[in-house]
């Protein structure tokens, strides 16, 4: 990772920054990624420029994941796989191979409930058996036509794990990441409390 330094915010990202009396800074940033709004709160003694760098680091990582694994982007690596893996095996990038391999593992662990082939033509519960990975050369092959892999049900959770790694690398101990109110990562503490209050639980008779 490059040194943390003053970093100019990219155009798609908006942010606000406030410095506390104790010398810690609160940065709130938001942008659109993966067809949803991403809200980021960072609380740290790092400078505003250093925190902006972290946000841009996260933004770039999400852009990379979208370019690789977005089912709906015809230019993505995954879209190329869906177009050509029945014709001949396709060698995958290391990360996409690992993602699909993990999803196949989850399919087995959930007894088929988690299935990345549900958008295939003439889909049935055995469609996923037509997806074949080769550990030898990290290639993928579809043994029947019409098979399509869609990682949309996996990608946001994977993205949060990627963001967590970035925050650890940048030594950010207090953070809240919200991707469309459906995928949330909370680390450390809120500026004025312990932990992060995500929502109230309302009980009704």
Language-model region placement:
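Mature catalytic core of soluble alpha/beta enzymes
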Residues: 1-205
């Amino acid at each position: 990772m490059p040194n943390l330094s003053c970093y100019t915010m990219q155009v798609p990202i908006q942010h606000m920054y406030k410095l506390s009396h104790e010398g810690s800074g609160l940065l709130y940033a938001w942008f659109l990624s993966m067809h949803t709004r991403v809200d980021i709160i960072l609380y740290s003694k790092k400078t505003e420029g250093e925190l902006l760098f972290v946000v841009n680091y996260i933004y770039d990582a999400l852009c990379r994941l979208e370019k690789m694994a977005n089912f709906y982007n015809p230019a993505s690596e995954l879209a190329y796989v869906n177009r050509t893996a029945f014709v001949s095996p396709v060698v995958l990038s290391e990360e996409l191979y690992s993602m699909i391999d993990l999803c196949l593992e989850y399919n087995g662990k959930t007894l088929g409930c988690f299935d990345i082939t549900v958008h295939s033509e003439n889909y049935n519960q055995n469609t996923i058996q037509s997806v074949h990975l080769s550990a030898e050369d990290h290639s993928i092959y579809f043994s029947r036509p019409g098979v399509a892999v869609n990682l949309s049900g996996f990608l946001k959770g994977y993205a949060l794990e990627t963001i967590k790694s970035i925050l650890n690398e940048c030594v950010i101990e207090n953070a809240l990441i919200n991707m469309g109110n459906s995928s949330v990562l909370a680390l450390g503490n809120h500026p004025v409390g312990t932990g992060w209050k995500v929502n109230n639980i309302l009980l009704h008779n």
